[in-house]
Amino acid sequence: MSDSQDKWDRIYARGSHNAKVAAILSRHTDLVQTSGLSLDIACGQGTNALALAALGMEVDAWDISAVAIEQLKDAAHRQRLAVNARIVDITPDMFPDNHYDLILNCHYLDRSLTTAITSALKPGGLVMFQTFTANKLADIGPSHQDYLLQPDELLSMFKDFETESYCDESQNVDRNDPLCGRAYLVARKPTGT
């Protein structure tokens, strides 16, 4: 077991880590297809994966934590939702080309995955990406710069995509707001690519 897996297993074993659907998804459900294949990257206990499945999508959900994946499988079974949940240490070579209609990435920043995410989306597919920012004013989320977005970084990561919505709440200090200290991008992969 890796140190990362052990860390997240301990966190998820203590109980619910985040039981709310991510703001990016709750604010933009109108853009989510009611069919097709989606991927929830670093899904944790699967709140977002379950929400996508409830909207009618087929869902692949990946996370390094065996505890979180087991909790997700139990919740999916109880709710009678189909979620293909897998314990994985996510690497770029895992992403099949032109496979997904939607890829959701919340609170997990691994810049080495950007090209893989881009390639894994079908033309016209949607990326929904939300995570913490480096210039956040609130003491929330990770502190290491490797795990924090720089200003406008999301826009540059998916610069060839058509932006549907972008929000930067770095200056937001309301810890009750699900976007406090975060930024998000909803963008569509151009057709014909």
Cite the ranges covered by each PLM segment:
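Conserved class I S-adenosyl-L-methionine
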Residues: 1-33, 35-44
